Amino acid sequence: MSPIRKPTLEERANSQLPLTSTVMQILLSLSAEDRHGLGIAADIKAFTEGGSVLGPSTLYGTIKRMLDAHLIEDLDSPAGDSDDPRRRYYRITPLGRRVLELETERLATLVGTAHRRRAFKRP
C-alpha cells in the first residue's frame, strides 16, 4: 500500500477559493501587519472608507474559521501591549498569503473582463 500523499500548498490554497469578502478583507488587513481583532476591524473600516463595518459576531466567527483552515494563526501579545491581557493577535500564514494572491489574481481577471465587455458605464 502506498503512503497517502499530502496536498501541496498550491492544492490547499486552490481548495479555499473563492473567498467571501470578509475573509478577503481580513487577509488583506493581516498582509500588512499582525493585528488583534479590533485592529483588524478598524483597518478594514479604514481601507474600505466605511463601506465594510464588521460586527463582533461576523469578525470573530470568521477568524475562528480562518484559524481552523490555517489561513491565519494566533500569536502572543507583542511586548509592550498591556492594554488588555485578553487581546489575541493574528498573523497571516504562508497558506493564507498564497490564497490571498490567488484570489487577487482571480478578481483582477474578473475586473479586466468587465472592462473589456464595458459592463458598466463610465462617467
Question: Could you describe each region identified by the protein language model?
Answer:
Residues L59-M66:
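Basic amphipathic alpha-helical segments that dock to polyanions
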Residues L67-P85, R91:
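Beta-hairpin "wing" of winged helix-turn-helix
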Residues S2-T20:
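A detector for short, charged/polar N-terminal pre-domain segments
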Residues N14-T58:
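N-terminal helix-turn-helix DNA-binding core of bacterial DNA-binding proteins
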Residues P3, L95-P123:
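Amphipathic alpha-helical dimerization/coiled-coil segments
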